[in-house]
């Protein structure tokens, strides 16, 4: 709209007064000096400073920005010319942008309604499309060969705030009818680009299409963001006429004309930590059963699958990403796949990840294409220009992508995610566009076997039906089987029945996956951490004494714990952990070479070595440690061993592992504090060093447990089912600090035979 010169001059004086007497003691005058010195042409004004100086002016800038954008630009340009007369050319202006709090005018693309048209808004979202940067003519210069005169003409479109829009036709003749020649070298242009901004996936309404708004950026704001970036854009929301350039239909196209673009980090919706939260997190990390606690807290409505839940926890925590000086990128994100029979809660586990992970995007194999997962080059319907559109994996940068029905995806589409899973980038080279986008995300996929149900007579590779090049990119591959066991079936049926019978106090059904259930308050100090025990909901599976009612964390606290450990803890490998990883990897390689063909779900390759490092680092994050210890490597090997060979550790091995973790945690805490922590002080006596006595058969329970642990670990690592007594004696004495006599070895083996754990015949011990 046209503004009279008197009002323009008054608005300009108001901004000059703001620049001369700004509250920040000359902050903006210094900003103008820096702008002139660095040859920039945009000044950002904070709304808080403008409100403190003139509240009425700040309100009018937001409500009617069309009246104040040009006076603000003229005021800043005048100050810049006073500092340096040569800074601006004739007719050139300094552009002005705004930042800071906008109150009710801080919205998402879904909240942009007709009431915001003509006002200044701050919109937050994620960039999904970017057009090519095109020049737009601002001033054309024409030469008349007959008269020898030059003729210039300025152009303004509907997006301009200065004056009324002009026509876009080039003049071909002057007023006397003489032909004109356009001097393209003397014309003035400015860059412009169109963006498409969509509401962030985690905040979009379920069951509704995400809303999108077109953004027009010009001059220095072009190419300031790329598809997948989360941005906060301040601009004027305007209505533009359609292609017919008329308003007969009464339908207009709305755009956001930006004056300031700010990049947001990936954790824009990060939780807020209190001092009490940090204290409780450290208490949880010092527990011996932290891994089991987090695993049980994830999707408590799903019965069993504890090892898979533990793996999902490690996946959400992730390892440590490394970018070496030579340009090598080592990914820290963990990829995981579940293959198994129908009705084993694979999809429900994916939904649990969607509920817990800070950023997660869900797709399906049949409903997703290769370009939909990575990136696509599309054409603008109005201009016909090529645009780069981000896919699900680019939008989930620094998050998790959940792909259900992975086996239903076409082979051509499945190949498209190979680069993402290993290099964590999406490279596009088509239609004249060559670009590389970041897709640093974890992938968790669920698939059914190729025959519908898992055929135990075939190898895992033949059951899965996916190429090895894709399977090797998954760090963990779990075979989830529908076990036909009457006892397990009874427990599952009781668990499902309790889920359906669970009601609130008023008799209504209550959601089991929402935070309302998780934050149920029982008046206790730990109410915000642990879920209140309910016999109908949790059943009778309570163990371990007094702490039995506090073995599940609330959803809210679990989100905080995972977010804190993932982003603020960056562990590094110790020498002891590195040596143990190398030794364990060599044993896995040797075991896979000696095992039968197809004995494991995944081949043991160099990627498996990186998998052990990532899992160990994730476990150290879970324990809130800044160093990866040997116990972290052991926990990672347990998860990896279950994924590859589908074998769980025995109770004896679990007890040995817990003792190792407790000892290393106590040593680590004592080294950090210089004293004892939680009553676990350093002692000169090892718990395994006991007095055997004069009688060889007087073996303590600790020595028996240590013997059984050594034997179990050796059998598990080498995948053997029988050994001679001589070999067992040599092995345990080689690994143990206190040697065992022959009679002690035979005595312990006889005890194990009485417990039906081994069978001894002709000097050969067969493991049952």
Swiss-Prot record:
ATP binds at residues 340-347. GO terms for molecular function: ATP binding; ATP hydrolysis activity; helicase activity; single-stranded DNA binding. A motif (Arginine finger) lies at residues 472-475. Keywords: ATP-binding, Cell cycle, DNA replication, DNA-binding, Helicase, Hydrolase, Nucleotide-binding, Nucleus. It is an enzyme of class 3 (hydrolase). One of its GO terms (biological process) is double-strand break repair via break-induced replication. The keyword ATP-binding applies. It catalyses: ATP + H2O = ADP + phosphate + H(+). Residues 290-497 form the MCM domain. Belongs to the MCM family. This is DNA replication licensing factor MCM3 homolog 2.
């Amino acid at each position: 709209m046209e503004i009279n010169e008197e009002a323009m001059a008054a608005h300009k004086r108001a901004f000059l007064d703001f620049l001369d007497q700004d509250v920040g003691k000359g902050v903006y005058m210094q900003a103008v000096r820096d702008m002139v010195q660095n040859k920039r042409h945009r000044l950002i004004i904070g709304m808080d400073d403008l409100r403190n100086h003139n509240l009425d002016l700040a309100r009018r800038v937001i409500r009617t920005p069309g009246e104040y954008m040009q006076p603000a630009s003229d005021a800043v340009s005048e100050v810049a010319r006073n500092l340096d007369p040569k800074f601006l050319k004739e007719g050139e202006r300094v552009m002005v942008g705004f930042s800071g709090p906008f109150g009710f005018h801080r919205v998402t693309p879904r909240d942009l309604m007709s009431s915001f048209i003509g006002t200044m808004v701050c919109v937050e979202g994620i960039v999904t499309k970017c057009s090519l940067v095109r020049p737009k003519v601002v001033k054309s210069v024409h030469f008349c060969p007959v008269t020898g005169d030059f003729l210039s003409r300025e152009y303004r479109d509907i997006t301009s705030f200065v004056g009324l829009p002009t026509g876009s036709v080039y003049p071909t003749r002057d007023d006397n009818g003489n032909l004109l020649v356009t001097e393209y070298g003397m014309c003035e242009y400015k860059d412009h680009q169109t963006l498409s901004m969509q509401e962030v996936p985690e905040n979009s309404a379920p069951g509704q299409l995400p809303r999108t708004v077109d953004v027009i950026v010009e001059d220095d704001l072009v190419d300031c963001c790329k598809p997948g970036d989360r941005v906060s854009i301040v601009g004027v929301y305007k209505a533009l006429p359609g292609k017919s350039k008329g308003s007969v239909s009464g339908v207009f196209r709305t755009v956001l004309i930006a004056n300031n673009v700010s990049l947001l980090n990936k954790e824009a919706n990060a939780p807020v930590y209190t001092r009490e939260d940090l204290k409780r997190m450290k208490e949880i990390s010092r527990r011996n059963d932290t891994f089991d606690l987090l695993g049980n807290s994830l999707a408590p409505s799903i019965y069993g699958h504890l090892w898979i839940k533990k793996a999902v926890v490690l996946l959400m925590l992730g390892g440590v990403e490394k970018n070496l000086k030579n340009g090598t990128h080592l990914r820290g994100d963990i990829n995981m796949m579940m293959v198994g029979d129908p009705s084993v809660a694979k999809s429900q586990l994916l939904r649990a990840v969607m509920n817990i992970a800070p950023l997660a995007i869900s797709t399906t194999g049949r409903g997703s294409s290769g370009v939909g997962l990575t990136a696509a080059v599309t054409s603008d319907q109005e201009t016909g220009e090529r645009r780069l559109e981000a896919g699900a994996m680019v939008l989930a940068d620094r998050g998790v992508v959940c792909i259900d029905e992975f086996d239903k995806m076409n082979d051509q589409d499945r190949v498209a995610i190979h680069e993402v899973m290993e290099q964590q980038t999406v490279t596009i080279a088509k239609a004249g566009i060559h670009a590389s986008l970041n897709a640093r995300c974890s992938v968790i996929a669920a698939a059914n076997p190729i025959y519908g149900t898992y055929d135990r007579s075939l190898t895992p590779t033949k059951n899965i039906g996916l190429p090895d090049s894709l399977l090797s990119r998954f760090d963990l591959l779990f075979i989830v089987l529908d076990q036909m066991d009457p006892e397990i079936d009874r427990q599952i049926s009781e668990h499902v029945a309790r889920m359906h019978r669970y009601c609130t106090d008023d008799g209504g059904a209550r959601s089991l996956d929402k935070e309302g259930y998780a934050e149920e308050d029982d008046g206790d100090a730990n109410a915000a951490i642990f879920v209140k025990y309910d016999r109908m909901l949790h059943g009778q599976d309570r163990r371990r004494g007094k702490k039995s009612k506090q073995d599940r964390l609330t959803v809210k606290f679990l989100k905080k714990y995972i977010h804190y450990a993932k982003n603020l803890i960056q562990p590094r490998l110790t020498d002891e952990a590195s040596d143990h990883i190398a030794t364990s990897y060599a044993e896995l390689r040797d075991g896979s070479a000696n095992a039968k063909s197809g004995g494991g779900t995944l081949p043991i390759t160099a990627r498996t070595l990186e998998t052990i490092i990532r899992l160990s680092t994730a476990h150290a994050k879970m324990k809130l440690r800044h160093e990866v210890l040997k116990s972290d490597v052991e926990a990672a090997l347990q998860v990896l061993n279950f994924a590859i060979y589908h074998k769980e550790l025995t109770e004896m091995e679990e007890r040995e592992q817990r003792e190792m973790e407790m000892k290393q945690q106590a040593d680590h805490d004592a080294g950090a504090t210089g004293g004892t922590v939680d009553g676990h002080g350093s002692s000169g006596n090892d718990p395994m060093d006991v007095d055997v006595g004069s009688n060889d058969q007087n073996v303590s329970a600790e020595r028996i447990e240590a013997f059984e642990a050594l034997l179990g670990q050796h059998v598990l690592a080498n995948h053997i089912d029988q050994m001679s007594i001589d070999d067992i004696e040599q092995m345990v004495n080689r690994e143990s600090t206190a040697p065992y006599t022959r009679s002690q070895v035979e005595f312990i083996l006889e005890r194990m035979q009485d417990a039906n754990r081994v069978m001894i015949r002709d000097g050969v011990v067969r493991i049952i």
